[in-house]
């Protein structure tokens, strides 16, 4: 499969991209999570979709192979929306499908609602977070299912502002192995991409852990605007996902042309936990969207 890589100038620096495949079908652009993670885990699964269309992966500014500026004012949703527009323009992506995962769904929603771009044929919200407050409420409920001592550790360190302690990190792992990735051992592509992630971006925009939003995304809520998304839409999540099936179904109910799929043996990274089914569901949705 043909692959093209390069850099694109965006507000704040250069971002690295990889274009896989050259089929005639509409390109798919993939927005990774974090904020501050990398494209690698998603590409390890979704590159196979390049057999009949170009699939574009990129590392958002600050992470992976992209420039890592230290200016904290760059880490805001509006700039990431501009970045996505720049990438589409640079690669001449007049028509696209978009797949966003986790934070990538926040970016996708902001892009669709605020930038009102032309040429987006469909949108896939993978393990979505479209209301930070709702995410926090879900996380609080999931934490209540952890061992009592783990719950107490989380509460104590968040109250005392000592979330960088080893105790808090260990408690985080208990939550993550239930609701982020249930595979044991953790897939190599996840462990190897960690050093390329950017904790500063994550802390500035989100917070010290998945269940403690304290950054500038803590007030993020696009649920009132979801009805404006009037293109074929797919919402997917795992049965044990921190992006819970209940909340994912709620978001789906607010979007006019939306469907829902739950991966029964997955948490937050269904694309790694149930790879074959994930690819099958995405492929089927894209074909359906293109047949309309």
From Swiss-Prot:
One of its GO terms (molecular function) is aminopeptidase activity. Belongs to the peptidase S33 family. Releases the N-terminal proline from various substrates. SUPFAM superfamilies: alpha/beta-Hydrolases. Its EC number is 3.4.11.5. This is Proline iminopeptidase. Gene3D superfamilies: alpha/beta hydrolase (3.40.50.1820). It is an enzyme of class 3 (hydrolase). Pfam families: Abhydrolase_1. Keywords: Aminopeptidase, Hydrolase, Protease. GO terms for biological process: proteolysis. The active site is at 102 (nucleophile), 241, 268 (proton donor). Residues 27-274 form the AB hydrolase-1 domain. InterPro entries: AB_hydrolase_1, AB_hydrolase_fold, AB_hydrolase_sf, Peptidase_S33, Pro_imino_pep. One of its GO terms (cellular component) is membrane. NCBIfam families: pro_imino_pep_2 (TIGR01250). It catalyses: Release of N-terminal proline from a peptide.
